[in-house]
Amino acid sequence: MASDKKAEQSYQDWEKPLFDAWKEKGYFGRTPGFGKNGANTYTIVIPPPNVTGMLHMGHALNDTIQDTCIRRARMQGYQARWILGTDHAGIATQTKVDKKLAEEGISRLEIGREKFIDACWDWREDYGNTIVKQIAGMGCSCDYDDEKFTMSPEYANAVRKVFCDWYHDGLIYKGRRIVNWCPSCTTAIADDEAEYVDEKGHLWYLRYPRSEPVDGMEYGVVATTRPETMLGDTGVAVSPKDERYKHLVGKTIDLPIVGRKIPIFADYYVDSEFGTGCVKTTPAHDPNDYAMGQRNNLEQINVFDEHAVVVEGYGKFSGMTRDEAREAIVAEFEALGLLDHVEDHDHSVMTCYRCHTKLEPWLSEQWFVAVDRLKKRAAEVVENGEIQFHPARWKQVYLDWLENLKDWCISRQLWWGHRIPMFYCDSCGWEDALMEDTDACPKCGGHVHQDEDVLDTWFSSQLWPFATQGWPENPDELKPTYPTQMLSTARDIMGLWVARMVMSSLYFTDQIPFKDVIIHPTVMAADGKPMSKSRGNGVDPLKLMQDYGADGMRFGLLMQVTGAQDLKFNENKLVSSRNFANKVRNAARFVNMNLDGFVPGEPEPKTEADRWMFSRLARLVRSLDAAYDGFEFADVARELYAFFWNEFCDWYIELSKARLSAGGEERAAMQRNLVFVLDTALRLLHPAMPFVTEQIYQELPGEKEAPYLMVASWPDADKLEKYIDPDAEQVITMVTQVVSGIRSIRARYGISPRAELEVVVKAQDDTAASLFESQVQLISTLANTKVSAVSVDAARPDESSVCLADGVEAYVVLSGLVDFDKERARLEKEIGKLEKDFTKFDKKLSNPGFLSKAAPEIVEKDRAKLADITDRLARLRAELAEISQEG
């Protein structure tokens, strides 16, 4: 077996051959079922990463969760398949190719649409598989031989059918609405894809002259964060409850610079406490103004073009960018004596998630999906429990998102993507959505052209669970595998993707797309802040796999998957996981080194230690099944760690050594039991740590149930139930507690392991006394002790230390071994130092000034220090109290 040093230095050297062997055997496709689950399928779909993507920590966490689930299902006998694929990522890919062309000194406008799309396909061929290779490096058992792509011909056909069917059912329509427009990418952007950035800005108070002075006042004052949009103002709004302005409703304003007369009107949207209570209204450049304009029949005037440049008709302002227009218009108001005053004002602005340009609310003609009919059923299947969310709190978040969902803008002004299949006759005005391209009008024979826009990437990805399984062309392929078992994804796309998959699946298949939705935590930096290149706090999973191996990274991440919303990445967990993998490897090495002359056979728990180990193993299987079924992955990792490290490695292996040395049938029985426990435990650990477990499995002797652990059977909790033995658990638990306590006392006082210690035992009753006496020889061997007395009325000797176990108190005699005066002085000195530290940190953390001014991570760090000091003080004071009794 590979040494620990080699394993740490060259994980890929032994991980990749195992992966290649699994792949060559065909284990990554749909595996044949077996056992009681053999007739059932277990299918999951990977959230398709962008074809432009590189593996990041979110992928690493989510792919670990999914692979853990699919590997267990495969071992449970299901016909398991994890569907792999990538998303064409419209705007992301177009941005990448635009950048590549720019480096070559050309633009897409110069080469035209057809050649640009060819360039996108070329880019995908050259770079698009990077993330798939990285997913493979994690050991993910996806179906690599049937990789899907959201722009493949089969998938494109499904997308087209959805558009045509919804169009003909009246669910897709074209409308003139406000959208989030990126002037740099020159396309609409979804609300949920916009990023919000805090900006230190201003609130400009502008004077708008009244057409006819009222009460001697010649102007009204409006407050705005965007003076450049005043060119498109078509009204001034006030609250109908605002007594200051009731008499002005119905009057008009002379819009400065432009000279347009605009009405003063009342609308309940207006907050009379904000600014002056008068709101300039620009229906074409603000969604709230648009809504007020619709309610009050205001004119809609676009003052910017698609590049956010002022359009013609505005004199010297035409041709200016938004920022230039803002500066010039404020200067003009000041020159006219119409700039009342300016205040500092912090607010959030929306930016493009790709290029980070400020988005412009822009009135334009777009294609929309009417969602009211669709979202009703999508809510019902969650409310009635057909789809379950994990953690359960995300159910309400999903329902709230649906309740507030507005019609979905699905058109994008890009070239790379699914082109909208709408066709228009240039002669007679005929138009329709078609499944096949045409250049001739079916009505008049005139020339036909296709819509220039493409569909939102989320429009195509909403079909992912069923379009990847043969729909609509091969419904028989979909039938046995649908709905899929579960979906694991991030919270930020619950609306963008999860809800839309539910809506489209219910419409087109009349079934839910998945039964369970896992919303995994977002991986944050150790300081709790989002990981980002600009902050320099990002973590590269590829580097982590080099340092800790794929298993170390996977298990370390699973240990951190609690029900929390965010996961503060803790690299120490990966260190622990790597050490854990080495512990498992060392335990397996011990077993293998003691298998000379091994004869396979049925395991037989003969001793209390055997019965304890088999019982703990049986309980572990039952417990892991419950944790997996509840998607409690941290519990899975914690219980596996505790069993392997504490029970199997630290105790059962140690308890086995005497019997292995005995020879004969004792040795043979011990060998069979060790192999049985190790083999079963490897199966339980395999989904989380596939490489090291497979490596060890291949080295186990004897005929195997399966050629590879990956397709071996998952332990059956019902079959192992017979091994559960509470009495044996009670006995060995007492043994381990006493031995651990005695060893702790040795370590505390620096007593050599070779020094035999006298122990007096007080039992709580005769049963406990009898139980202890039955294990005296074992305890004495493990702890190097001489038990001088066991009784219910035993007295504690002078100069002794006590360790507690279930049903007994073991008094370890220390006379002649410990200088109690010296030990007491040492403890008092250490306690005094810690008390000073406690006072310092407690005072600091009780100071409101520090709490309000210090960075959150500093406060958190100091709280952790105080908690550690408190814990250490408690332990040292307990030791001092014991010393005082002993001395």
Which functions belong to the PLM regions below?
Residues 1-52, 58-62, 89-98, 117-229, ...:
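Active-site neighborhoods of enzyme catalytic cores
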Residues 7-11, 15-20, 137, 141-142, ...:
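NTP-handling and nucleic-acid-processing catalytic cores
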Residues 33-97, 150, 159, 222-225, ...:
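N-terminal catalytic cores of NTP/NDP-binding nucleotidyl/phosphoryl-transfer enzymes
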Residues 37-46, 68, 104-107, 132-139, ...:
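Active-site-adjacent bridging/hinge elements
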Residues 41-43, 77-83, 89-90, 148, ...:
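Beta-sheet entry/capping signal
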Residues 44-49, 499-507:
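Short Ser/Thr-interspersed hydrophobic loop/turn segments at strand-loop and sheet-helix junctions
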Residues 205, 400-459, 463, 507-550, ...:
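Feature 926 captures the class I aminoacyl-tRNA synthetase adenylation module centered on the KMSKS loop
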